[in-house]
């Protein structure tokens, strides 16, 4: 009989301390493989394996592509790569971001649901936004066990709260109680996999993350997931499909970028900010050119032309000032409010 031998853990803001607290209580003879995704910057090395390794009775390391999965080990997603499970091997993929992240919690969880099914235990810890919610739904659909950190304890409760709003989780616990539960559950028999077939959407989305499809097949598969919306992808600017996933509002483009409603909103705000700064740059270049034309017009005694371009400079200055004020938070509809950054994770990278 199969046991619960696949434990997948996702964390974001506040996640370093949460992971340390959880990992230090896992037994040295844990009969399961543990996979961890922590949102970290893409452009810096991660010291998470070393930090966790100092507290863990289990060996901890960044995962290597195509290495065989072994029980009693902790695999950490390296920066800028999705950590995935494929049968009995680890896959590292530099694929499209999900929920603006690479590595993505959803991508790991979905791959575990696809290949490990009821043997999977999913754990969502502290974090901002809602990465992990769709992945936990996939684990639930496949008969796996779902655990979240108690939102009242989590320093950033958005991620565990989001999961609890979407599915009926099996356990909501304090950090001190999660590891003992994992030690126990990993020694219990999992349900029969045949009782929980892989849903078509989980199969398709896991295949997309694992880069198993050619372009034509990818577009056809995206059509199966939902209908084309009137929205565009913040990453590649292609069309977005609205995914049919019960009451969970999600989107995908045909390249493979995936978004929850919350992450799409954040992506749109980032895209808008880039566009507005581009507008400021264009207006300032327009002013520079107009001022050069004014200088030449005055030297040629072309006063009418000079006055016309002076008005253009005034208009461009007014527009540029208004946009700058909006970007810097000095106007209503402030878009310059910073998103919650994983400052703690950045400090260890």
Task: Kindly give the residue locations of the regions a language model identified.
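Short, charged, amphipathic alpha-helical segments
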Residues: 303-314, 338
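Short helix-adjacent coil turns
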Residues: 256, 297-304
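Conserved acid/base catalytic micro-environments in cytosolic active-site loops
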Residues: 1-295, 311-332, 346-348
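Composition-driven low-complexity segments enriched in polar/acidic and proline residues
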Residues: 333-345
């Amino acid at each position: 009989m199969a046991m619960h031998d696949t434990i997948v853990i996702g964390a974001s803001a506040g996640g370093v301390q949460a992971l340390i607290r959880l990992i230090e209580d896992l037994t040295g003879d844990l009969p399961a493989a543990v996979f961890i995704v922590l949102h970290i910057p893409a452009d810096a090395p991660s010291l998470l394996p070393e930090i966790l390794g100092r507290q863990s009775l289990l060996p901890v390391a960044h995962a290597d592509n195509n290495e065989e999965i072994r029980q009693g080990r902790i695999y950490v997603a390296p920066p800028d790569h999705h950590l995935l499970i494929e049968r009995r091997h680890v896959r590292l993929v530099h694929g499209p971001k999900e929920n603006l992240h690479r590595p993505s919690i959803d991508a790991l969880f979905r791959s575990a649901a696809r290949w490990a099914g009821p043997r999977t235990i999913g754990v969502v810890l502290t974090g901002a936004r809602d990465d992990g919610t769709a992945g936990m739904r996939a684990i639930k659909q496949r008969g796996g066990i779902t655990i979240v950190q108690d939102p009242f304890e989590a320093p950033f409760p958005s991620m565990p709260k989001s999961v609890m709003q979407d599915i009926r989780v099996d356990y909501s616990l304090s950090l001190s109680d999660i590891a003992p539960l994992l030690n126990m559950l990993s020694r219990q028999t999992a349900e029969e996999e045949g009782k929980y077939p892989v849903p078509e959407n989980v199969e398709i989305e896991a295949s997309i993350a694992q880069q198993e499809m050619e372009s034509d097949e990818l577009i056809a598969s995206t059509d199966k997931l939902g209908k084309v919306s009137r929205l565009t992808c913040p990453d590649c600017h292609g069309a977005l499909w609205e995914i049919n996933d019960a009451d969970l509002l999600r989107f995908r483009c045909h390249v493979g970028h995936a978004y929850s409603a919350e992450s799409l909103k954040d992506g749109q705000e980032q895209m808008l900010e880039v566009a507005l700064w581009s507008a400021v740059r264009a207006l300032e270049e327009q002013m520079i050119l107009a001022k050069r034309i004014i200088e030449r017009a005055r030297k040629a005694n072309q006063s009418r032309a000079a006055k016309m371009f002076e008005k253009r400079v005034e208009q461009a200055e007014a527009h540029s000032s208004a946009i700058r004020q909006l970007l810097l938070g000095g106007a209503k509809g402030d878009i310059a409010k910073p998103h919650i950054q994983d400052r703690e994770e950045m400090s260890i990278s």
